């Protein structure tokens, strides 16, 4: 409860703005690409924690259930997606507080996973992952690079000259990025956010 009170209304600004709430595999399949999260804000009431993600000009608000998943509609570039959000607080081996979120896209059979580390009051670090994710994509990549015979000569030649380990590292960095954020103060902190819980079903 003490941590929630301290977080209430706090805004953090992303150092890297290339990561979005939408899973990478869904961005590709739906041709619906993220604008990248620029700021994140925490709010809470007596029962729930809310997290506002400012992505482009849009505010995506998720309600987080601790005992049961919270159902939330997310509008991504005009397309509606139903999510189930479950969260829990814990600590890592160094005693750092960690908020773990599981954001399941119910109708898509995909899940966005987020761990938010709170090393101190002025900084957070967000570690992203998704399911299906790194393992499936890297396994597919390995099959391709081993030579399928279905590649165009240009792609085949290109794959021959790019080390597989380098490709895997780049893919891992894209699917499982770690982004640092700094606490904002002053009147500009809330600029851009639209405060609403209309998309939260409960």
Name the predicted role of every residue range.
Residues 1-202:
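Peripheral terminal and inter-domain segments
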């Amino acid at each position: 409860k003490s941590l929630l009170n301290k977080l209430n209304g706090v805004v953090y600004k992303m150092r890297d703005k290339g990561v979005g709430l939408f899973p990478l595999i869904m961005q590709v399949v739906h041709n619906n690409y993220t604008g990248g999260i620029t700021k994140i804000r925490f709010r809470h009431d007596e029962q729930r924690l809310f997290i506002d993600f400012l992505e482009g000009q849009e505010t995506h608000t998720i309600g987080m259930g601790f005992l049961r998943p919270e159902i939330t509609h997310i509008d991504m570039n005009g397309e509606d997606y139903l999510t189930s959000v479950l969260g829990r607080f814990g600590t890592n081996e160094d005693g750092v507080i960690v908020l773990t979120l599981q954001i399941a896209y119910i109708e898509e059979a995909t899940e966005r996973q987020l761990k938010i580390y709170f090393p101190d009051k002025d900084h957070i670090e967000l570690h992203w992952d998704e399911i299906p994710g790194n393992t499936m994509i890297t396994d597919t990549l390995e099959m391709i690079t081993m030579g399928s015979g279905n590649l165009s000569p240009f792609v085949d030649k290109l794959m021959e000259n790019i080390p597989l380990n380098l490709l895997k590292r780049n893919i891992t960095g894209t699917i499982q990025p770690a982004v640092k954020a700094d606490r904002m103060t002053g009147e500009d902190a809330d600029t851009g956010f639209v405060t609403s819980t209309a998309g939260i079903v409960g």
